[in-house]
Amino acid sequence: DLAKQRTAENPVFYVQYGHARVASVFRQAAALGLDRADVAGADASRLSDPDELALIRSLAQFPETLEHAALEREPHRVVFYLMELAGDFHRYYNRNRILGEDRELARARLLLAANVQKVIRAGLQVLGISAPDTM
């Protein structure tokens, strides 16, 4: 049964795992002395990697996606959006070192990750699905 599978083929698991992955990054950051408060003043202009820019564009689409899903009574739009966002973040995570030696770049990347997590959490909440910090 797909709904019970803990694999990338299960869209709920895949999106929840994206949320949990960001939480894991923040646990690692805390071990390095960085917390969410440090992220608030991060310089987002440090984000120039194509994967980072794609994530930023994707995040900007969330309000419009929610609006269209509500107006058209098509909740699957939110599901598809979240799957794409989670996929983009998983790719970004696998290609880039979020917590590298450049502390200012790490802060900017954590800011991006925090916003991905915030949008995933909000989207899952709209769908009535939990957003776990660990899996």
List PLM regions with ranges:
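Non-catalytic interaction-recognition regions
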Residues: D1-M135
